[in-house]
Amino acid sequence: RDLVRSRGLGDVYKRQDYEIVEWNEGNTDLHENKYIERAYQLKKWAFVSDYVRMKVLYDYGGIYFDTDVEVIRSFPDDLLKLPAFTGIESFSLLVSPGLVFACESGNVVAKMMMDSYNRDIFENTGIDTIKTINVRITDLLVCNGFEPCEKKQTVLDVTVFPSSVFCAYDGKIRRINIREDTLSVHHYAASWLPWYRKIRLFFGTKLRHIGILK
């Protein structure tokens, strides 16, 4: 099935059997726990989203993508029949729900993630030291047998796919590398970073490309 295909601000296409839902301040309880309340007060929107996506998926089920993800191929039926699935990043080997996180309502891992936020308090210690959702979910899955490596594996009720499937960013050549099994591409717009970090990310990547070409 074709889920959603979007190029920047261009047209968005969707199948009739899928619905795109926007979650915002109007339909989200921003005082549900201390973590989300404090993150919202400090305008750390990405960290607000980290909790909200897990709660919505736990309550309703569905498929979550970051806004800079492009679905390039139909998701096969055997994938969509899984109780839950996500992917890893090639350069970090961390589980990354921003690539995709799909699950049925009542998902065990989504609930465990919600519980971890409910026990936590958001501390604005700087973008480099705040525990990201990737680190949080990877730590959780490692405690339950996950191995951070490039292989398909199922932990609890979530199947984690290698980076070629949902990431497509090749850490070795430092650019997007679409393969036969690639279903979606993460373009890494890094919307949560301040402008000076985006510049460093951009020029750092470009300089590494130059180094490879020499």
Predicted regions mapped to residue ranges:
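GT-A fold catalytic core of metal-dependent nucleotide-sugar glycosyltransferases
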Residues: 45-96, 102
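Membrane-proximal basic amphipathic "stem/tether" segments
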Residues: 1, 187-214
